[in-house]
Structures are given as C-alpha cells and as structure tokens.
Amino acid sequence: MDVTHESLSGLEIPILKIHQGQIANGKYCAFVIGRQHPGESNGSHVLKGSLDRILSGEEFSLKLLKHCDFVVIPMLNPDGVIAGNFRTSLFGKDLNRLFKAKDTTLLPEI
C-alpha cells in the first residue's frame, strides 16, 4: 500500500494498487473509492468482499487482472469516519460533490 495523501487532520489515506505483472498501457484501470461518505459503513464490507475476490487467484480474478489494473482507496474520508459524520468531511463538506475542487489545503482528500 502506498500512502501519498493525508486527510485534513493528518490521517493517512492509503492507496492500494492491484495489477498482474507490470502496470501496462492498453489495460483498463478501475479506480475504486470506499468510505467517501463516512456513514456508509456497509461499503467497507462490500469493498472487502470485492478485494477478496480480485485477490483470490481464481480463474475469474486472473482473467480480470489480465485486462484491468485497480487503484483502490479503501477509506477516502477517515476524518469523517472518526468524527461520526454521515456524509461530510471534518470540514463539513460532501467530498462526493467536490471532485473538481482546487483547494488542496481544505480538501486534501480530493
């Protein structure tokens, strides 16, 4: 896992890169985000099940990884999770609505 970003409060936001062999041009890349809305805890369970399947080594997962790389952020909004917020970050913003935001000081998660 890489940690390339921190949340507003300084918590690490890990990034998991899953690929078979070298990351290659011409392959699809799926970008998967979990816990963008902190109150949607069921998303963590779905993401874990999905990762278990992708990493299972089964025929399906091997075929999938042959054609697609994955970049996974298991918890995009750790501040909101710890604060007990339902939809918002520590700053009170819904990160789902701010992907075009340019303010990396107040919205480092994006």
Model region roles, listed by residue range:
Residues M1-V3:
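Non-catalytic propeptide/linker segments at domain boundaries
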Residues E6-H19, A24-I110:
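Active-site/substrate-binding loop(s) of hydrolase catalytic cores
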